[in-house]
């Protein structure tokens, strides 16, 4: 494939997964890290690895002498040494030393983003003194965030100053660090977007995800984020623009806040693979690690290579953290191995409380199904989620990734169509419900039918009374199977609707059920879904 050798500064789990991706592409990797048991070195049995620190100029120069490209799995490296080795040898370094230097100082990162018109929380530089922190409280109010400018990750280096009485403790915790303060951002969710940038400056964003933190460490990631499509797209655009402002190629993790008023703010950026992107290994066309390797070596980056594997793919990433019990976290991994569509990734690290030991990816066509599997893996339920097992929990008809669209010409049809919705809920099938009239809103009907496959729908149930043109009109504009439900009217008892729907011309098929029989329409939709995906094939009987 490619004869380039990639040198990686840092040998942790991110380096390990970069190595895995590079090996599949026949790209040699050399690691700079202390010791021979670093996670990245464990899976790459070469004699060329450098035993040393990624902050040692001599070790960096030694690594550069063996490689064509240098990259990082951690931003806290000696960027001055990178600049010097690049001047001396001309070696390619991605991301650029300038970018790494800007990003690893979080206050400089904020100033850079502001300069480039990227929305961030208001912040200011502060001194390590009680008087300075009291001034911040007077300026921003309480609470506010006190942060270390450097060497801060996984919540380390952050302190919430809730009121004036917390200032002494904040100074003790962040003793002797360069600091800055940030105005409190009243967020409703934390989101993240992975963005990969090519050598020629093109950017490609992965789906927007939602991150859940516990004790300041990422605990779970929901992909895609449980927000509406507009917010998802706005987050991708914001992330793209933020990454475009930095020079150099590679993958970037962009963390952001979704505020209570709906605005988005960039929290911080990582110039490397990121914990919030681990789900991409199993849920996307190309993992964040392979995308990074492609970007820094100039390999092809085709359109849509950062998309989810299918339009309806849903995923949850669960971090495996070290606990108080030695190797106790591996009990959770064993449960994951018992769970269909759950993949375990361990990093080869010695257990320590709070340490990232690995992660688990759960992938399905339904977020509810992913959550059900997550609950078993975490031990909150003792029932192994078999393929045919479905809970009876109701799924809202406003699911962000529905598989079935339930439409009708008027809200007067809802009492009939709700019977079908209840069946879909019973079988835990995600669906959406909306009013689409063939006569009153024809343009909306056309857009709905045309866009349905792109949004991940697999089947449409259309209820209509009277002239009942809706099912046939929708079927004429979508490749999806359409099931028509004749709704009983006030004059001809629904026979007119039945005759209208069932007599579609050749080439425009519409499956037609009995008058008012939305129940059978839903069961037929479930059968269609099962036939198209054996992994989610449902077992049921007629009643």
Curated annotation (Swiss-Prot):
Q: Which reaction does it catalyse?
A: 5-amino-1-(5-phospho-D-ribosyl)imidazole-4-carboxylate + H(+) = 5-amino-1-(5-phospho-beta-D-ribosyl)imidazole + CO2
> Which pathway or pathways does this protein act in?
Purine metabolism; IMP biosynthesis via de novo pathway; 5-amino-1-(5-phospho-D-ribosyl)imidazole-4-carboxylate from 5-amino-1-(5-phospho-D-ribosyl)imidazole (carboxylase route): step 1/1
Query: Which InterPro entries does this entry report, sorted A to Z?
Result: Ade2_fungi/plant, ATP-grasp, ATP-grasp_carboxylate-amine, ATP_grasp_subdomain_1, PreATP-grasp_dom_sf, PurE_ClassI, PurE_dom, PurK
Q: Where is the ATP-grasp domain?
A: 110-297
Q: EC number(s) per UniProt?
A: 4.1.1.21
Origin superkingdom: Eukaryota
Any one Gene Ontology BP term: 'de novo' IMP biosynthetic process
Q: PROSITE patterns in the record, alphabetically?
A: ATP_GRASP
The UniProt entry's sequence similarity note says: In the C-terminal section; belongs to the AIR carboxylase family. Class I subfamily.
Name the PANTHER family on file.
Answer: PHOSPHORIBOSYLAMINOIMIDAZOLE CARBOXYLASE (PTHR11609:SF5), PURINE BIOSYNTHESIS PROTEIN 6/7, PUR6/7 (PTHR11609)
* Stored HAMAP family: PurE_classI (MF_01929), PurK (MF_01928)
Its recorded name reads: Phosphoribosylaminoimidazole carboxylase
Supply the source organism for this entry: Ogataea methanolica (Yeast)
């Amino acid at each position: 494939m490619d004869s380039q050798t990639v040198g990686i500064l840092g040998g942790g789990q991110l380096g390990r997964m970069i190595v895995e991706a590079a090996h599949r592409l026949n790209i040699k990797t050399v690691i700079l890290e202390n010791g021979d048991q670093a996670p990245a070195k464990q899976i790459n049995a070469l004699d060329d690895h450098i035993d040393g620190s990624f902050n040692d100029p001599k070790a960096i120069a030694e690594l550069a002498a063996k490689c064509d490209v240098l990259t990082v799995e951690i931003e806290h490296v000696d960027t001055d040494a990178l600049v010097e080795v690049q001047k001396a040898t001309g070696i390619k370094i991605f991301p650029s030393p300038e970018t790494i230097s800007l990003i690893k100082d979080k206050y400089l990162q904020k100033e850079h983003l502001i300069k480039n018109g990227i929305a961030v929380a208001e912040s200011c530089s502060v001194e390590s003194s009680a008087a300075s922190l009291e001034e911040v409280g007077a300026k921003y109010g309480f609470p506010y965030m006190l942060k270390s400018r450097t060497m801060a990750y996984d919540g380390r280096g952050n302190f919430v100053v809730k009121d004036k009485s917390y200032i002494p403790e904040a100074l003790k915790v962040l003793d002797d660090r360069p600091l800055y303060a940030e105005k409190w951002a009243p967020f409703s969710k934390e989101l993240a977007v992975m963005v990969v940038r090519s050598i020629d400056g093109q950017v490609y964003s992965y789906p927007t995800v939602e991150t859940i933190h516990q004790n300041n460490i990422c605990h779970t990631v929901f992909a895609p984020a449980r927000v509406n499509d507009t917010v998802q797209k706005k987050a991708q655009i914001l992330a793209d623009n933020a990454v475009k402002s930095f020079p150099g190629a590679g993958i970037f993790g962009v963390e952001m806040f979704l505020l209570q008023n709906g605005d988005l703010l960039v929290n911080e950026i990582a110039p490397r693979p990121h914990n919030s992107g681990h789900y991409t290994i199993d849920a996307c066309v190309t993992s964040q690690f392979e995308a990074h390797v492609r970007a820094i070596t100039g390999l092809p980056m085709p359109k849509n290579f950062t998309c989810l594997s299918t339009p309806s793919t849903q995923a949850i990433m669960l971090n495996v953290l070290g606990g108080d019990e030695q190797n106790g976290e591996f009990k959770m991994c064993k449960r994951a191995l018992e769970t269909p569509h759950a993949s375990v990734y361990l990093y080869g690290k010695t257990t320590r409380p709070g340490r990232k030991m690995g992660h688990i990816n759960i992938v399905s066509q339904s977020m509810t199904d992913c959550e059900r599997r997550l609950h078993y893996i975490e031990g909150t339920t003792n029932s192994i989620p078999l393929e045919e097992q479905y809970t009876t929990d109701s799924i809202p008809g406003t699911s962000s990734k529905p598989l079935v669209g339930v439409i009708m010409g008027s809200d007067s049809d809802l009492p009939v169509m709700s019977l079908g919705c209840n069946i879909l809920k019973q079988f835990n099938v995600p669906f959406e419900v909306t009013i689409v009239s063939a006569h009153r809103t024809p343009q909306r009907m056309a857009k709905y039918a045309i866009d349905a496959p792109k949004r991940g729908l697999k089947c449409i149930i259309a209820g209509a009374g009277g002239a009942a043109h809706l099912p046939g009109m929708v079927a004429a504009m979508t490749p999806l199977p359409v099931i028509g439900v004749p709704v009983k009217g006030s004059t001809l008892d629904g026979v007119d609707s039945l005759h209208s729907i069932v007599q579609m011309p050749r080439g425009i098929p519409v499956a037609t059920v009995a008058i008012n029989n939305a129940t059978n329409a839903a069961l037929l939709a479930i059968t269609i879904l099962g036939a198209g995906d054996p992994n989610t094939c449902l077992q049921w009987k007629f009643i």
